[in-house]
């Protein structure tokens, strides 16, 4: 979703997708997905341990993606100046980590509250 969403947003602004960042969005999504697939939030349980794993996965994925992957791809694909892209990467990594943990965490928590727990329904 990150790959498609990022590419479509770039296109909707009337430009050409910035492929290094589109690829990084996909990388972050894959890493977070691999980390969090075993949390089983679809069962309606998002306890402190799961919140911690979710937060850690997002921070690790975003920091590696935006501080390493995106700047390196910017340099390789677009010949951008290293100092500029690594500075952008640090800002993006930190801001995306905070956003993903806070907004993403609240969305997952809200989602788990909508799920009926096993055995919570009585047969009449």
Feature locations, PLM:
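Interfacial aromatic-anchored transmembrane helix boundaries in multi-pass membrane proteins
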Residues: 2-38
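Membrane-embedded alpha-helical hairpins and interfacial helices in multi-pass inner-membrane proteins
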Residues: 15-20, 35-124
């Amino acid at each position: 979703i990150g790959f498609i969403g990022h590419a479509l947003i770039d296109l909707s602004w009337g430009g050409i997708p910035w492929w290094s960042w589109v690829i990084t969005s996909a990388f972050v999504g894959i890493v977070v997905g691999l980390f969090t697939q075993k949390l089983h939030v679809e069962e309606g349980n998002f306890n402190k341990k799961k919140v911690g794993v979710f937060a850690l996965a997002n921070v690790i994925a975003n920091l590696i993606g935006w501080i390493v992957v995106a700047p390196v791809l910017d340099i390789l694909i677009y010949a951008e100046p290293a100092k500029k892209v690594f500075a952008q990467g640090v800002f993006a990594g930190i801001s995306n980590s905070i956003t993903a943990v806070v907004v993403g965490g609240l969305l997952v928590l809200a989602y788990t509250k909508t799920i009926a727990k096993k055995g919570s329904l009585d047969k009449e």
